[in-house]
C-alpha cells in the first residue's frame, strides 16, 4: 500500500479513523508503516463544522476506508505516471483560461481584493511591471499576475509593491552587454517576501530567497515569458463583457473528446479495468468489447461539427466550413457525411480531383449513399468540361465515361460524350471500348467504386439548370451554320449547390436530441409560413372575377330570393289586415294576438281539473271561457256600452269544452258572456294603486306589463270603498279577495274552510245582502255540506274608498286571526314580503279632485276607525 496516501487520509479524518484502523487491522499496522506521528491540523480545522447528525455517516465511511485499504491505497494504481517531458508536452493540449475573477463583477471591491490577496503566500512567484524609481533606491512596481501553476489576476488591484535595492539582484544588461538600471514599463519576475492583505502592501525580492531552483531566473524578463492566460486578456477591459462559460466553449481544446491523454497524464491506462474490486481487475476478453459503441460515440461528436460546416457552406463561409469539416474528420475519419460535404466544398471551389477523392472514400464506406453518387457524377461532368476547355479530349472522354458508369442515365454526360464522338478530333483520340461508350454496364476499373445505379435514376435524369452550354453544342452549331456562341466562364459553369436532402436530414435527425438546430428550424418554418401567406394573398388579389361568377350557383340564389320575397309579401299582407281591423273596430279593444305555440304557462292545468266535474255555475262559466278568468258580475254588465262585434277570424273562434252535469251526462258548457274589450272612458274614479297580488298560479310567471294589464282587465274582484284619511299623505292598503281556481279545486281536502275569513277583504266592511241575481241553490247529494254558494263565494265587500281596485286574491293559507286595520300586511307562510314596496291607493273623484283631499268623515266610520287603531 502507499503509505503517503494513508498518512494524508489519517490527517484529514483524524483520531476517529486511527481508532477504527487499529480495531480493524491491528494496533501494530500503523507503526509498521511508520505513521506514529501524524499531523492532525487539517482535522482540527474541520472539526469546528461537524454536526452530531452526521456522526453515523462519518463512522461508516471510516469503517469502509479501513476495511478496503488494500484496494484503495494500492501502489499499482499510480505506478504508470508519465515522464516529465510528456507531461510538459501535454500541457499544451489543455485550455488556458483566464482566472474566474477576471469575469467577476463584485460590488464590494475592497472585500474582493482582500480575499484574493489572502490566497497569496510567501514564496509565490509573480510578474510585475515597473512604475517608477522612488527615493532611497526603492523600486515601485505594479503586480500583474502569478506564475503557473497558480492562476491569479492582480492587475486590477491597486497594490503598493516595493522592491528594496538589497533585493534587486544583478542589474540587467543592455544590447552592448553593459549593466543598466531598471526603467519604467520593464517586466520583472519577483518573489513575495511579506504580504499584508489588510493594508494592500507587498514586499518583493528578485534573488530567490525561498525558491532555490536553478532553472528559474528572476529579474528582467520578456513579454513572451508571461503566462498564456494573461497574454490573452492583458488588452481586455476588466470585468470582461463575455461570460466564462462562453469563453470555455469557444476553446478548441475543450471540444476535443480524446480523453486517453488525460488518463496517461494522471498515471492511468485507458484500456485497463479500474475497479476497487480485485476480482474485476482481470478484465474482459478484447473480442467482447463493442467497437460499434465507440464508433457511434465518435460519430455523434463528429456530426455536431458536420452540421456547423454545412451551415457555413450554405451561408458562403467556406473557410469556416472547411475548419468544421476537418475537425469532424479528425474525430471520426469514417464519417460519410463529412466526406460528402467536404467533397462538395472542394468541387464548388474548383478542386475537382480533391472532391473526387472524398466522394470515392464515402462510396467505399457506403456504396449506396445517394448524395455521394449524385455529387460525384456532377463533379465528373464539371471535370470533363474543364478538360474540353484545355483541349484535353482524352481526359474529358474518360471523365464522361466514368460519370456514365456511375450514373448511366445522366443526360448531360451522354450528350457531351456523343458530341465528342461526332467531332473529328475526338474520333481519332477516343479509345474505342464498347462497354464504356454504351454506359449500360458498370466498370470496376473506373475511378468510381460504385456498383449500384438503381437509387439515383431520378436524380440523374433531370439536368441541372445552372450548368452552362457544353463544348459539343458549339461544334453542333458550327455544322448547322448558325451563329457561334461564346463559351461561358469555367468557374460559373462548374459551380453547383449542395442539395439539402439526405445529408442535412440525417444530420438533423441525429442532432434532434441535442436540440442544437431547433432555432434554425423554427426560423425556416416561419419563413415558409410567411411565403405561403403572401402567395395566398396574391392569389386572392389576382383571382379573376369571372372565375368567381362561374362558381356561383344562380339557381340556389334565385330560390333564396323567392323565399325572401314571399316572406316580405306575407308580412305586408298581415300588416295591412291589422291596420284595417284597427280602423274598423279596434278602438274599443285591440285585436287578439295570432295563435302561438303553447307555453308552459298556458299548457299547465289548474288544480280543479284533476278533481273531476264541477256542479257550480261559476265553474261552468270558467270552463266555457277557457279557464282564463271568470265573467264579471251581472251588475256591471250593463254599465258599459257593448262594442260593435268585430268580424272574428278563424283562429279567434274558441270551441266550447264538454262538461259533466249533476246526473253525470256530458254536455257542451254554457257559453260565457264576453268581456268588455278595452277600458271605459267614463268619469268614474279609477284606482292608481298597485295592489300586490299574491296569486301563486299566474302572477309569478308573467312580466310586470302583463301583470298590470291583468290587474286592470281581468280582475273579478272589485271593491268600492270610501277612504276617509286624516292626512293628505295617508296611504291605504286595498287587499281584496280574488277568485283563484286553486282555492276551489280541492273540495274534499280537510281544513279547506279553516281560513275562510282570510279570503275576504282586509278593509273594514259591512256584509252585503244575498245577490238577487244568483239564487242560493238547494242541497245536492254530490256536494259536501257547508259548501258556499256562488253568491256568497264571490261576494264583494264594501271598502271605504271609492276606488275600483282590481287585484288578484291573496294566498289561500293565511293565519286565521290577523290584525284587520289598514296598516296590516299579509305575511303568511307562503307569501313573499317586500317591506320596501307598498301599494298606494289613490282615488280620483268624479269632479277631478284627489281622494286625499280632506272630506268630512261620517260619524260611524270615524268611530270605527278610532276603535281599530286602539285595537292595533
Curated annotation (Swiss-Prot):
Q: Where are the TPR repeats?
A: 302-335, 336-369, 377-410
Q: Any keyword Phosphoprotein?
A: yes
Biased composition annotated in UniProt, kind: Basic residues = 515-537, 685-734, 753-778, 793-814
SMART domains assigned to the protein according to its UniProt record, in alphabetical order? TPR
Q: Per its UniProt entry, which superkingdom is the organism in?
A: Eukaryota
The alphabetized UniProt keywords are: Phosphoprotein, Repeat, TPR repeat
Cross-referenced PROSITE patterns: TPR, TPR_REGION
**Phosphoserine PTM sites in chain numbering:** 536, 540, 606-607, 769, 771, 778, 780
- Pfam families under this entry? TPR_11, TPR_8
- Residue segments, region Disordered: 419-468, 494-872
Q: Has UniProt tagged this entry with the keyword Phosphoprotein?
A: yes
Bias class Polar residues marks the residues at: 432-441, 600-618
Biased composition of type Basic and acidic residues is found at 419-431, 538-562, 569-587, 860-872
According to the UniProt entry, which residue ranges have a biased composition of type Low complexity?
442-453, 735-747
Phosphothreonine modifications at: 538
The entry's family comment says: Belongs to the TTC14 family.
Protein name according to UniProt? Tetratricopeptide repeat protein 14 homolog
Species annotation: Drosophila melanogaster (Fruit fly)
Amino acid at each position: 500500500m502507499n503509505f503517503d496516501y494513508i498518512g494524508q487520509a489519517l490527517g484529514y479524518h483524524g483520531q476517529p479513523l486511527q481508532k477504527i484502523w487499529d480495531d480493524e487491522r491491528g494496533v501494530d499496522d500503523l507503526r509498521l508503516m511508520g505513521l506514529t506521528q501524524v499531523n492532525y491540523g487539517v482535522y482540527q480545522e474541520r472539526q469546528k463544522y461537524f454536526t452530531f447528525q452526521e456522526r453515523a455517516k462519518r463512522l461508516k465511511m471510516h469503517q469502509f476506508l479501513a476495511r478496503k485499504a488494500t484496494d484503495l491505497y494500492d501502489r499499482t494504481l499510480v505506478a504508470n505516471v508519465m515522464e516529465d517531458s510528456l507531461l510538459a508536452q501535454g500541457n499544451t493540449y489543455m485550455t488556458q483560461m483566464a482566472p474566474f475573477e477576471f469575469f467577476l463583477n463584485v460590488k464590494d471591491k475592497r472585500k474582493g481584493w482582500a480575499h484574493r490577496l489572502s490566497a497569496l503566500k510567501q514564496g509565490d512567484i509573480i510578474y510585475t511591471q515597473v512604475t517608477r524609481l522612488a527615493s532611497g533606491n526603492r523600486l515601485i512596481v505594479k503586480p500583474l499576475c502569478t506564475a503557473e501553476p497558480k492562476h491569479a489576476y492582480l492587475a486590477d488591484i491597486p497594490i503598493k509593491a516595493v522592491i528594496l535595492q538589497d533585493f534587486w539582484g544583478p542589474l540587467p544588461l543592455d544590447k552592448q552587454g553593459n549593466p543598466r538600471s531598471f526603467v519604467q514599463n520593464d517586466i520583472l519576475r519577483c518573489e513575495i517576501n511579506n504580504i499584508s492583505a489588510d493594508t494592500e502592501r507587498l514586499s518583493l525580492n528578485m534573488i530567490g530567497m525561498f525558491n532555490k531552483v536553478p532553472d528559474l531566473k528572476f529579474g528582467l524578463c520578456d513579454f513572451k515569458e508571461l503566462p498564456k492566460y494573461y497574454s490573452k486578456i492583458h488588452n481586455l477591459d476588466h470585468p470582461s463583457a463575455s461570460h466564462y462559460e462562453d469563453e470555455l466553449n469557444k476553446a478548441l481544446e475543450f471540444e476535443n473528446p480524446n480523453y486517453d491523454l488525460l488518463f496517461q497524464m494522471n498515471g492511468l491506462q485507458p484500456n485497463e479495468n479500474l475497479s476497487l474490486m480485485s476480482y474485476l481487475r482481470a478484465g474482459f476478453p478484447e473480442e467482447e468489447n463493442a467497437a460499434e459503441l465507440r464508433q457511434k460515440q465518435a460519430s455523434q461528436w463528429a456530426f455536431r461539427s458536420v452540421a456547423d460546416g454545412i451551415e457555413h457552406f450554405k451561408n458562403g463561409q467556406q473557410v469556416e466550413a472547411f475548419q468544421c469539416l476537418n475537425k469532424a474528420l479528425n474525430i471520426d475519419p469514417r464519417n460519410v457525411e463529412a466526406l460528402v460535404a467536404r467533397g462538395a466544398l472542394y468541387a464548388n471551389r474548383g478542386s475537382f480531383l480533391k472532391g473526387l477523392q472524398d466522394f470515392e472514400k464515402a462510396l467505399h464506406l457506403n456504396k449506396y449513399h445517394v448524395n455521394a453518387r449524385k455529387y460525384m457524377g456532377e463533379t465528373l461532368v464539371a471535370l470533363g468540361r474543364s478538360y474540353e476547355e484545355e483541349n484535353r479530349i482524352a481526359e474529358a472522354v474518360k471523365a464522361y465515361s466514368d460519370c456514365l458508369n456511375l450514373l448511366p442515365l445522366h443526360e448531360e454526360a451522354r450528350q457531351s460524350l456523343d458530341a465528342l464522338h461526332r467531332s473529328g478530333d475526338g474520333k481519332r483520340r477516343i479509345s474505342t471500348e464498347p462497354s464504356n461508350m454504351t454506359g449500360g454496364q458498370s466498370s470496376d476499373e473506373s475511378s468510381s467504386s460504385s456498383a449500384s445505379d438503381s437509387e439515383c435514376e431520378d436524380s440523374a435524369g433531370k439536368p441541372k439548370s445552372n450548368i452552362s452550354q457544353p463544348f459539343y453544342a458549339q461544334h453542333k452549331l458550327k455544322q448547322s451554320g448558325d451563329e457561334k456562341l461564346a463559351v461561358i466562364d469555367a468557374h460559373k459553369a462548374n459551380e453547383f449547390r449542395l442539395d439539402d436532402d439526405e445529408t442535412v436530414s440525417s444530420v438533423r435527425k441525429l442532432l434532434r436530441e441535442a436540440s442544437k438546430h431547433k432555432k434554425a428550424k423554427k426560423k425556416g418554418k416561419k419563413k415558409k409560413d410567411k411565403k405561403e401567406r403572401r402567395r395566398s394573398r396574391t392569389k386572392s388579389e389576382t383571382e379573376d372575377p369571372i372565375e368567381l361568377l362561374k362558381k356561383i350557383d344562380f339557381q340556389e340564389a334565385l330560390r333564396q330570393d323567392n323565399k325572401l320575397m314571399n316572406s316580405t309579401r306575407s308580412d305586408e299582407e298581415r300588416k295591412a289586415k291589422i291596420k284595417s281591423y284597427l280602423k274598423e273596430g279596434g278602438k274599443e279593444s285591440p285585436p287578439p294576438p295570432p295563435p302561438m305555440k303553447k307555453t308552459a304557462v298556458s299548457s299547465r292545468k289548474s288544480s280543479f281539473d284533476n278533481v273531476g266535474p264541477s256542479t257550480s255555475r261559476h265553474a261552468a262559466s270558467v270552463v266555457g271561457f277557457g279557464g282564463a278568468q271568470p265573467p264579471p258580475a251581472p251588475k256591471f254588465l250593463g254599465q258599459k256600452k257593448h262594442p260593435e262585434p268585430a268580424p272574428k277570424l278563424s283562429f279567434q273562434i274558441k270551441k266550447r269544452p264538454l262538461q259533466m252535469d249533476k246526473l253525470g251526462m256530458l254536455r257542451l258548457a254554457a257559453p260565457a258572456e264576453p268581456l268588455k274589450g278595452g277600458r271605459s272612458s267614463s268619469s268614474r274614479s279609477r284606482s292608481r294603486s298597485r295592489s300586490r297580488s299574491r296569486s301563486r298560479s299566474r302572477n309569478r310567471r308573467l312580466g310586470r306589463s302583463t301583470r298590470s294589464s291583468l290587474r286592470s282587465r281581468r280582475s273579478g274582484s272589485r271593491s268600492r270603498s270610501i277612504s276617509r284619511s286624516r292626512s293628505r299623505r295617508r296611504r291605504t292598503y286595498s287587499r281584496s279577495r280574488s277568485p283563484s281556481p286553486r282555492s276551489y279545486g280541492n273540495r274534499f281536502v280537510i281544513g279547506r274552510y279553516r281560513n275562510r275569513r282570510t279570503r275576504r277583504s282586509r278593509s273594514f266592511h259591512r256584509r252585503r245582502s244575498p245577490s238577487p241575481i244568483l239564487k242560493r241553490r238547494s242541497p245536492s247529494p254530490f256536494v259536501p255540506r257547508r259548501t258556499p254558494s256562488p253568491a256568497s263565494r264571490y261576494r264583494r265587500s264594501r271598502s271605504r274608498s271609492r276606488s275600483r281596485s282590481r287585484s288578484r286574491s291573496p294566498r289561500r293559507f293565511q293565519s286565521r286571526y290577523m290584525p284587520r286595520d289598514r296598516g296590516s300586511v299579509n305575511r303568511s307562510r307562503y307569501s313573499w314580503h317586500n317591506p320596501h314596496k307598498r301599494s298606494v291607493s289613490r282615488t280620483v273623484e268624479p269632479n277631478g279632485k284627489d281622494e286625499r283631499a280632506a272630506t268630512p268623515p261620517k260619524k260611524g266610520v270615524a268611530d270605527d276607525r278610532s276603535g281599530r287603531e286602539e285595537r292595533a
